[in-house]
């Protein structure tokens, strides 16, 4: 079992990340972290048939309720949040209760937000079942829901008391979902560690085959990178903002399509390509380096171009709904080279339109799984 401790400097808290196969069946581990008398498991219609019974079997001496939500980013909203709150209140879950997030990034985000706000805050544990959640959403304490006007506009910083990652859950993950998670993996390599970029280029085939050692090493590296960044900047006042590489463009694409055309990781992949285009336009990276970015994304079976008709002006205006906008200025994370990045707030409308045009090449295609 691999173990990592995340330190949150602001509140002087820490919580463990445990990584191993078959954690869901480890009753002694669950009892170690689930001392609460009343537990609510929040999951969705896709994950519940796969893992809910195994988790409940490990908690037989507890009073456990489950809340099964509809699957998809389009359900990460205030209506779903309200439904969860009502269910918890009707079940008389007290402040000594515990929430368990059983699922991917959407389940992680909404469960954490409920935990942050229900009766002014209760404990929660996250058990991420997707690659995207394991390498990104479950680490760092960001929680929230979407609003019709923008992604993750309502939320809180509220870390869990533990993150339990069962790598065996990735065996049931559809190929498209697995590739979506690889977008966040590639992000760390591009902004933080060029040696990890080389490792991914060498091991991508093994990762796609879900080979155990490669998979565990990759996940551990990503969790370590994010924990280092979160420890230095929990509330995104500085270094943590670099984790938004590809997300400003990506969130706009998700918002404008109502979260129904691309998975989050797919939108981020296109967003990273767009950020790489902008970085090259500004002379920050070479054409060969940009090509290296696009090549790795494509090897991971990720889209790198806008494949539907979207109006440039609509995309541009949607960018301003991003929560990272400051004093009316868009903020983008650009590459300073491969393995390093920085934030800029002086990108012009002309540059953005040029990036959009360059990122919808008809010579590129993406075959959905």
From Swiss-Prot:
- Per the record, the major location class is cytoplasm
InterPro entries assigned to the protein according to its UniProt record, in alphabetical order? Dehydroquinate_synthase (IPR050071), DHQ_synth_AroB (IPR016037), DHQ_synth_fam (IPR030963), DHQS/DOIS_N (IPR030960), DHQS_C (IPR056179)
Q: Which GO terms describe its biological process?
A: amino acid biosynthetic process; aromatic amino acid family biosynthetic process; chorismate biosynthetic process
Where does the chain bind Zn(2+)? Answer: 184, 247, 264
Q: Does the keyword Nucleotide-binding apply?
A: yes
Q: Which Enzyme Commission number(s) are on file for it?
A: 4.2.3.4
- Where does this polypeptide localize? Cytoplasm
Q: Keywords for this entry?
A: Amino-acid biosynthesis, Aromatic amino acid biosynthesis, Cobalt, Cytoplasm, Lyase, Metal-binding, NAD, Nucleotide-binding, Zinc
Recorded GO CC terms: cytoplasm
- Tell me the residue numbers annotated for binding NAD(+): 71-76, 105-109, 129-130, 142, 151, 169-172
Q: Which cofactor does it need?
A: Co(2+); Zn(2+); NAD(+)
The pathway is: Metabolic intermediate biosynthesis; chorismate biosynthesis; chorismate from D-erythrose 4-phosphate and phosphoenolpyruvate: step 2/7
Gene Ontology molecular function: 3-dehydroquinate synthase activity; metal ion binding; nucleotide binding
Kindly give the HAMAP family that the UniProt entry links to this protein: DHQ_synthase
Give the protein's biological function. Catalyzes the conversion of 3-deoxy-D-arabino-heptulosonate 7-phosphate (DAHP) to dehydroquinate (DHQ).
Q: Give the record's family classification.
A: Belongs to the sugar phosphate cyclases superfamily. Dehydroquinate synthase family.
Q: Which NCBIfam families match?
A: aroB
Please state what the protein is called: 3-dehydroquinate synthase
Q: Which organism is it from?
A: Dichelobacter nodosus (strain VCS1703A)
